[in-house]
Amino acid sequence: MKQFSSNTQSGFTLVELIVVIVVLGILAATALPKFINVSTEARVASVNGVTGALRSAVSLVQAKYYAAGNTAATTVTMQDNSTVTVAAGTGIPAGTAAGIGAALQSTEGFAVDYTTATAVTFRPTNGGGANCQVAYDGSTGLVAQPVTSGC
């Protein structure tokens, strides 16, 4: 009868472990730039998303304004009972927090500058600047083309 030795050891050799570490390092080095680019793409998508939301909000407020039939009114009560400040005669949301800010209902994730009512800017709070924003004109109701060159 053959006896087995209890001194035999099994495992990975040092060369095998080094090869695995090198392969993992190469994979990590090629994947990292792709993840960095994703955050830029996310900011661009978020600016484009708020652009669409602004245009929709203006249209909805104006539709509700004209449906109410009072073209002298300076506020519009929306379906959820929120009040939006508008320009009398046109129903365009004002370039204020009580105007376009209330029409959007949420500006979470954006720094909004209401300093100039004719150029209200929406910038992502995480990495937004002058080259990563969209502007709203409270006098005309127009939403400018988004600027995404610096997101």
Describe these PLM feature segments.
Residues 42-68:
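Membrane-proximal N-terminal amphipathic helix
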Residues 36-40:
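Hydrophobic alpha-helical bundle architecture
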Residues 7, 21-24, 48:
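Short glycine- and Lys/Arg-enriched binding-loop motifs that mark or flank ligand-binding interfaces
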Residues 63-151:
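Periplasmic/extracellular, small/polar-rich flexible segments of pilin-like filament-forming proteins
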Residues 13, 30, 45:
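Conserved Walker
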Residues 1-12:
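N-terminal leader/signal peptides at the extreme start of proteins
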Residues 10, 16-19:
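Internal alpha-helical transmembrane segments of multi-pass membrane proteins, especially GPCRs
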Residues 18-33:
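Alpha-helical hydrophobic helix detector
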